[in-house]
Regions:
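N-terminal leader/targeting and pre-domain segments
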Residues: 7-14, 19, 25-29, 37-74, ...
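Transmembrane signal-anchor/signal-peptide helices with a preference for the extracytoplasmic
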Residues: 1-4
């Protein structure tokens, strides 16, 4: 039996390499039948079955990868020939040859596709936005083998939708339109070009996946996908739409150096490893909102030419958005930063909003320039804040913000409108040394200070406006308030509660991991302790409140 199959295999491979279209398609069909026969043969060992089928698949893939010179002739894709009669005759002959070659190759891919398709449960089918999990699908009979299509020019439609590539799929360096859906091993798409739409929605990638250096000319959907290992999209260019909505990244995700020509949305995502977006360019509106980052998030050195929506995010690791340029509004409202956050050296062509957020680590928002207003209204800062050397084109507002440690605003410039510090609470001291207020006096109505901390209110020598100070020693801005002795005691009590909750979160994270139920509960307790303090402080800035 083995000798007979070997002879059929060798003859089929010979015919597949040349001959008529009918002979080559027949040879491909023979190889497919041989593979199915080996899989059904229970007499030979599993290792032998796998080896024989992989050998057949390698031969089929080699046929797909083999170059075909006429596919690179752009004129053959025209509707009508050009030139004299001799050239027209050649056009029709070569185009017929090209169509015939495409027919052979499509038949091979169709046979492969039919045997790598996966089936999902009814529940998953009814909810296309739910990321697939391992138990939600069953693989095809050929899913457990490796496929190498690297460097292929797909000059015909390719349909890999609903496919399960269990041992890896290599599509690196390809030019094609491709709709692959489910991968079980390392998948390499690097350096590929997609001239039309590319749909990878609802995919599961069990191994490391490489999409680096790709070019997408049409609409691209990667949303609703699950990446179990490292995924690399770096250096890619996307067309009118790039969607990564509701995806889960179990390991590191690298989107660095990408260019988005049109709208980009990666909202409602979960990043369990590092998330790297460094050096990317967004030419239209961008949504990176409503997402969870378990480890470090790097969004530094990016350029946003449309509206930037980065609100309602949770950053459990360090956050770095330094050196960015925003042409339009940038929204960072209602975010939680559990570690240090940096916006150093960024430029805002419109307004920046970081309101109603919680910053548990140090914040660096220095050496920034803004044309519009900048607001951190209603936010709470648990560690030191650096606002030094900034230029505000309009006003700066920290109204109702709570600063528990020192705030350094020195050597900044506020141009149009008044800087708004109304009802803010500075519990750890603040410096306005060398600040220049150009248009109006800053407003400190019902602002709350801790008289035990250090303060510097001596603005720049050439400042058009000064901070209006009340009489007394120590002296504070007119309209502001200071904590009473009883208030200082309560502040200490609240901070002790926060420190205990933060310590419990740190211990639980080391013990159970970033995203365990115990850690989520500890984060909730820390947030509750922080909100309790903020609510108490804000009650002191209300009219006629005893402190």
């Amino acid at each position: 039996m083995r000798t007979e199959r070997t002879a059929r295999f060798e003859e089929a491979v010979r015919q597949l390499g040349g001959g008529t279209v009918e002979a080559r398609m027949g040879a491909a069909r023979t190889l497919v039948i041989l593979a199915d026969e080996w899989l059904a043969d229970t007499v030979v060992t599993e290792h032998e079955r796998h080896h024989q089928v992989q050998t057949i698949i390698d031969a089929l893939c080699e046929s797909i990868r083999s170059p075909f010179s006429l596919a690179y002739r752009a004129e053959l894709w025209a509707d009508e020939p050009t030139g004299d009669l001799q050239e027209q005759s050649r056009f029709y002959a070569e185009r017929a040859e090209l169509v015939a070659e495409a027919k052979v190759r499509r038949s091979i891919l169709t046979e492969i596709h039919e045997r790598v398709r996966w089936m999902t449960t009814k529940t998953v089918s009814q909810n296309p936005y739910a990321p697939l999990k391992t138990g939600d699908f069953s693989p095809g009979t050929w899913s457990g083998f490796a496929y190498d299509f690297s460097g292929t020019l797909f000059f015909y439609p390719v349909d890999f939708r609903g496919s399960c590539w269990g041992q890896g799929l290599n599509l690196s360096g390809c030019t094609h339109r491709e709709d692959a859906n489910l991968y079980g091993g390392p998948a390499d798409f690097s350096g590929s070009t997609y001239a039309d739409d590319a749909d990878f929605f609802g995919s599961v990638y069990a191994g490391a996946t490489d999409f680096s250096g790709c070019a997408y000319g049409g609409y691209t959907r990667f949303g609703g996908s699950l990446y179990r290992e490292f995924v690399n999209f770096s250096g890619s260019t996307f067309g009118p739409y790039a969607g990564f909505i509701s995806s889960v990244y179990r390991s590191d995700a690298d989107f660095s150096g990408c260019t988005y020509t049109g709208y980009m949305s990666a909202s409602q995502c979960a990043y369990h490893g590092r998330a790297i977006f460094t050096g990317s360019t967004y030419n239209s509106d961008t949504r990176l909102n409503h997402s969870h980052y378990s480890r470090a998030a790097r969004l530094d050195s990016c350029t946003y030419k449309g509206d930037a929506f980065l609100h309602d995010n949770t950053y459990c690791g360090t956050f770095n958005a330094s050196g960015c340029t925003y042409t339009n509004p940038a929204s960072f409202d209602r975010c939680t930063y559990l570690q240090d956050a940096s916006f150093v050296g960024s430029t805002f062509g419109h307004y920046f909003t970081g309101s109603d957020s919680a910053y548990y680590g140090r914040v660096a928002f220095n050496r920034c320039r803004s044309t519009g207003y900048v607001t951190f209204a209603g936010s709470i800062f648990h560690e030191e804040v650096n606002f030094t050397g900034n230029v505000y084109g309009m006003n700066l507002s920290v109204r109702e913000a709570v600063f528990l440690e020192g705030v350094d605003c020195s050597n900044s410039v506020c141009h149009e409108r008044a800087a708004n510090f109304r009802e803010a609470a500075f519990m750890g001291g603040v410096s306005f040394a060398g600040v220049r207020f150009v248009a109006n006096e800053p407003a400190f109505d019902r602002c709350l200070f801790n008289s035990m901390a250090g303060y510097l209110f001596n603005v720049a020598m050439g400042s058009e406006h000064c901070i209006p100070m009340a009489a007394g020693c120590p002296s504070f801005p007119i309209g502001s308030r200071t904590l009473t002795e009883q208030g200082l005691i309560r502040l200490s009590s609240y901070r002790q509660s926060i420190n205990r909750a933060a310590k419990a979160l740190e211990v639980m994270t080391r013990r159970t991991g970033q995203d365990s139920p115990e850690v989520l509960e500890a984060r909730t307790e820390l947030h509750a302790a922080s909100e309790a303090l903020a609510s108490w402080v804000r009650s002191l800035t209300a009219p006629d409140t005893a402190r």
